[in-house]
Amino acid sequence: MKFAKGHGTENDFVIVEGTGPLPPEKVVALCDRRAGIGADGVLRIIRAGELLASGEIDELAPGINADDWFMDYRNADGSVAEMCGNGTRVFAHWVRSRGLLEEDTFTVGTRAGAKQVTVHSFSETEAEVSVEMGPAQVLGVSTASMAGESFAGLGVDMGNPHLAAVIPGLTAEDLAAKRLEQPVFDADFFPAGVNVELVTPLCDGVIHMRVFERGSGETRSCGTGTVAAACAALADASQVTGHVRVIVPGGEVEVEITEDGSTLTGPSRIVATGETSL
């Protein structure tokens, strides 16, 4: 099987094309960092109509046409994920740089709906991409605990569930020293599980964030999580809209929160291509 390896702010992915089956055990094998290629997840590039015909999705969401490219995203544990912001940037970079599309602005199908992307610049190995992420839907306040520490956060639906906890007085140095592990959360509030972000308060338009992702563990970045974190940080600062620079262990991205939507802008890198027997 041919594959590529890419990342968006070091949230890394194995990229595969084609309509062949992608069972959970294959995803786990590909993402294994010792016995496989190693990644936080798998980006499967497939036409939306082909995914529908295979029965892997029940219908095409509004705005997704049968001939649109669909990001079939899988977590490292083999589970299906609704959306991945960093993955969408890498996905868009791949289809644009490999000539699968000739336009710089196009629709990417996801299980969280149609996402408009703009590839601002690209080469075979590097790109800068914006993704229209849709509205950050605030679910309310919930709590969780991690490594013996309890905290309250803002529940945010970005097509996938997030609990973004802005911790008063938390510095970037304090955040870097924290131990992240499987969180204990309110399963009634988050019945499908949750991605948990720990966030520093907004300062001069900048926040720092770390994330423990559902199905992947701690990752170097999470695109949907940066939008959820920006939303929570703005709310903590008594703001509804704004532009936030989000610094994660793997780099930084720009998030714009408006009254009716959100935009995520950041880099994509393709670092390898090859073939695997997995």
UniProtKB/Swiss-Prot annotation:
Primary localization class, coarse: cytoplasm
Pathway(s) where this gene product acts: Amino-acid biosynthesis; L-lysine biosynthesis via DAP pathway; DL-2,6-diaminopimelate from LL-2,6-diaminopimelate: step 1/1
Pfam family, one: DAP_epimerase
Cell location: Cytoplasm
The entry's keywords: Amino-acid biosynthesis, Cytoplasm, Isomerase, Lysine biosynthesis
Entry EC no(s): 5.1.1.7
PROSITE patterns (UniProt xref): DAP_EPIMERASE
GO molecular function: diaminopimelate epimerase activity
EC primary class: isomerase
Known catalytic reactions: (2S,6S)-2,6-diaminopimelate = meso-2,6-diaminopimelate
Superkingdom as given in the UniProt entry: Bacteria
GO cellular component, one term: cytosol
Residues that coordinate or bind substrate: N11, N75, G85, N86, N160, N195, E213, R214, G223, T224
GO terms, biological process: lysine biosynthetic process via diaminopimelate
Active site: C84, C222
The UniProt record lists the keyword Amino-acid biosynthesis: yes
Positions marked as site (Could be important to modulate the pK values of the two catalytic cysteine residues): H162, E213
Record function comment: Catalyzes the stereoinversion of LL-2,6-diaminopimelate (L,L-DAP) to meso-diaminopimelate (meso-DAP), a precursor of L-lysine and an essential component of the bacterial peptidoglycan.
Family affiliation: Belongs to the diaminopimelate epimerase family.
Quaternary state and interactors: Homodimer.
Protein name listed in UniProt: Diaminopimelate epimerase
Organism: Corynebacterium aurimucosum (strain ATCC 700975 / DSM 44827 / CIP 107346 / CN-1) (Corynebacterium nigricans)
